[in-house]
Amino acid sequence: MSEYKDTLNLPETGFPMRGDLAKREPEMLQRWYQEDLYGAIRQAKKGKKSFVLHDGPPYANGDIHIGHALNKILKDVIIKSKTLSGFDAPYIPGWDCHGLPIELMVEKKVGKPGQKVTAAEFREKCREYAAGQVEGQKESFKRLGILGEWDKPYRTMDFVTEANIIRALGKIADNGHLLKGFKPVHWCTDCGSALAEAEVEYKNKVSPSIDVRFKAADEAAVLAKFGLAAGHEGKGDVSIVIWTTTPWTLPANRAVCLRADLEYVLIQVEGEQPERIIVASELAKSVMDRAGIEHFHNLGFATGADLELVQFQHPFYSFTVPAILGDHVTTDSGTGVVHTAPGHGQEDFAVGQQYGLEVANPVGSNGVYLPDTELFAGQHVFKANDSVLEVLKEKGALLHHHAYEHSYPHCWRHKTPIIFRATPQWFVSMEQAGLREQALTAIKGVHWMPDWGQSRIEGMVAGRPEWCISRQRTWGVPIALFVHKETAELHPNSADLIEKVAQLVEQKGIQAWWDLDTAELLGAEDAANYEKVLDTLDVWFDSGVTHSAVVDARQEFNGAEADMYLEGSDQHRGWFQSSLISSVAMKGKAPYKEVLTHGFVVDGQGRKMSKSIGNVVAPQDVTNKLGADILRLWVASTDYTGEVAVSDEILKRSADAYRRIRNTARFFLANLNGFNPTTDIIPVEDMVALDRWAVGRALAAQQEIIQAYQDYNLHAVVQRLMNFCSIEMGSFYLDVIKDRQYTAKRGGHAQRSCQTALFFIVEALVRWMAPIMSFTADEIWNAMPAQQADGSARDKFVFTTEWFDGLFGLAEGEELNNAFWNDIQKVRGSVNKLLENARNEKLIGGSLQAELVLFADDSLASKLAKLGDELRFVLLTSKAVVKPLAEKSEAAQATDIDGLFVQVNKTEAEKCDRCWHHTPDVGTIAGHTTICGRCVSNVEGEGEVRKFA
């Protein structure tokens, strides 16, 4: 063998078997940035049709977590696939930089504004802190192989973006959607500020559940409503009973609310202390049961409408409150009578407005009752629950109480219970200019993926309250408005003033607002009557208006609107909604054409990531150990529309899949050794049939892969890629061609035909991989022949190219078409089982020691005969003869194909030292006593002729 070793076409490539990604990827990254890969993509795609995926900004605080990695990798895969599809798809990453979490981090270092540092100094410290956080997260994202405008990202704290946020506020005000109101809003007493809907999370909490008596102010008037005749009125005090789980709100009670069409019953409680109580008829038994009242009877009935405006005594204050009517009253639980405190609940506020009730708010921003609050001044509301219960007992107003566990709103930052508290705030009104209906209409014009996203956001928009956009914070974009000191009306020239302020902020940042001398801008006369608003904007407003402040403003987008928003499914109540509402308020349309959502990352058992459980998978750990391409392949392998599971075992499976794909690519590259596409490509019509079949399988795979990318169905991309590499190539084609590739005449037709197929296929394969396994695709690209099929130099990067258009397939009308090769593969699979049995029975060693006789029915025999002597190369045996089924020998074995029996014989022929086939002519050729005639031809002669395989 040693004398013929140099005549073999042994595979050779600089592309290593082991990825060693953790070490190699940072080196590739360095080259990408030194050679400005992102800039090269932009240049290559200039003037193409645009695709804009607008980045939802992560918050500039802390290290990135696995959820961030999932989100950014999905975006990067989609953008790279769009680039390969011929789109100009710029990616400008963003960061959300204002708000409370940053304030809290800075407070730990320098104290609260106004103590050790001025408000201006505090804002500057916040800006510095946020900038540092952005840089840290940026490097982590780049390490994942995310390409984008990293040198010029958008940050909501950039002066120009802050100015554009102010301009967006002005546009919304100009369109009639801004509202100043004294309304109950979600309020965190730890933040000391209002919260947006998206900043509220629900957790279980134990509260006091109480039934409270409100005595009738005029018993006779109440009894008359129940139509009771004299002598049949019953005995004891008359009370209406409310149920609540927030006793601390009772000081702000200003009414009891009933439903107009509900039936209410006046119940006579019997015993030593008789009394008469009013509750909804449907709930009477449950009220009596929990109060432990066994002896009672009904005195009379009335509807809620009958009782409207009847007066009842407040349980511990000296004033009376009316019975009012509201549609929000249900019989799901409680008493059918709702305690109504307009200052502490949105429904209470709304119904209170209809009746002109006082909006009492006895609670300060820190959650403590104000000094003039009778009985409870200075107490924190949640601690005051016990005090309220004691007062109710003293007054004889407490019918029943027990501990009650229920879902309750909490601050997402502090994880503490929040309250509803009426305060003067600025709102984007959903009603006053028809914004809600406009938004619901706009939703219908958007493609939501998954499709349940549409009904989800429709329900949220339909039921949401006014959007409270004001915050009482230091680090935020100011609500840059001037209001009249007495009437609180906006300055009549607000539109012009907002633009002037925006221009100042564009030069100096938000501090310009606080430094602004009102008289300089308004003139002395107006300055005497108007004052600056000192509130800041909700950070959801900051990020929500980036469709205008960033997408419309950045020249990279060339005036194009966003095609896609892609975030976690929680953003239906967050960024998707704030973006939608602000865009409709500003432009009358949605800010996006498509919205794609992904689920949350959980562990292998479906549990949320938790440090206490110890199941947190950090993306930095994965890249340092396995490499970013493994993480990227994990992301693409999942059905990301639901929960996405990750664990060491799951990542190991991704690493195994990666190795199979890498090894397939390596086989292609190693067998292109010595191949020059400019001179060595064989014309399609002259190629060996099996090689054309392989290119055709690549074409079919490419069509499915491109479609899956277009549908954002990434796990289908990975499945098709794996099937192509492992089954179509690995289990069949690559196995069959090894003999021809290694032993055919070097540079001869048989080898070059095979190399032509391998070259075309790897040209396609590297592009399929590029969006997902970006580092490995780049590595493959650099190991490929420097010239392309047309003789032109290869692009420096695969990412600047488009899907390979040089693939071709077999025509269905051909004799050896796809159906033919499908049948051949089935025969090969059946034969392999018999060869395996023969090996196990020690009849043969390897398959090349076998000679086969295939007894086949006429149809199959004619197909097999078309391959002639080349059938043995497909079956990997030294001989394969086809005979009619009628001549079947006793030694022939049945297969799992009808009409096919196979006899396996051990060859008696000598083994060729060069190709290892056993043929009768080994040792018969002068000067070449150890090799077969085929090898002699491949070494010294014209080379063997292959037509089929």
Swiss-Prot record:
Enzyme Commission number(s) of this protein: 6.1.1.5
- 'HIGH' region (motif): residue ranges: 58-68
Cofactor binding description:
Binds 1 zinc ion per subunit.
Where is Zn(2+) bound in this sequence?
912, 915, 932, 935
Record-linked InterPro entries: aa-tRNA-synth_I_CS, aa-tRNA-synth_Ia, Anticodon_Ile_BEm, Ile-tRNA-ligase, Ile-tRNA-ligase_type1, Ile-tRNA_ligase, M/V/L/I-tRNA-synth_anticd-bd, Rossmann-like_a/b/a_fold
Task: Provide the catalytic activity annotation.
Answer: tRNA(Ile) + L-isoleucine + ATP = L-isoleucyl-tRNA(Ile) + AMP + diphosphate
Q: Which NCBIfam families match?
A: ileS (TIGR00392)
What job does the chain carry out?
Catalyzes the attachment of isoleucine to tRNA(Ile). As IleRS can inadvertently accommodate and process structurally similar amino acids such as valine, to avoid such errors it has two additional distinct tRNA(Ile)-dependent editing activities. One activity is designated as 'pretransfer' editing and involves the hydrolysis of activated Val-AMP. The other activity is designated 'posttransfer' editing and involves deacylation of mischarged Val-tRNA(Ile).
Sorted alphabetically, which SUPFAM superfamilies does this protein's record hold?
Answer: Anticodon-binding domain of a subclass of class I aminoacyl-tRNA synthetases (SSF47323), Nucleotidylyl transferase (SSF52374), ValRS/IleRS/LeuRS editing domain (SSF50677)
Cofactor(s) it depends on:
Zn(2+)
Localization per Swiss-Prot or TrEMBL: Cytoplasm
Q: Where does ATP bind?
A: 611
Name of protein: Isoleucine--tRNA ligase
* GO BP: isoleucyl-tRNA aminoacylation
Which cysteine pairs are covalently linked by disulfides here? none
Homology family: Belongs to the class-I aminoacyl-tRNA synthetase family. IleS type 1 subfamily.
The answer to whether the entry has keyword Nucleotide-binding is: yes
Main subcellular localization, coarse class? Answer: cytoplasm
Q: How does it assemble?
A: Monomer.
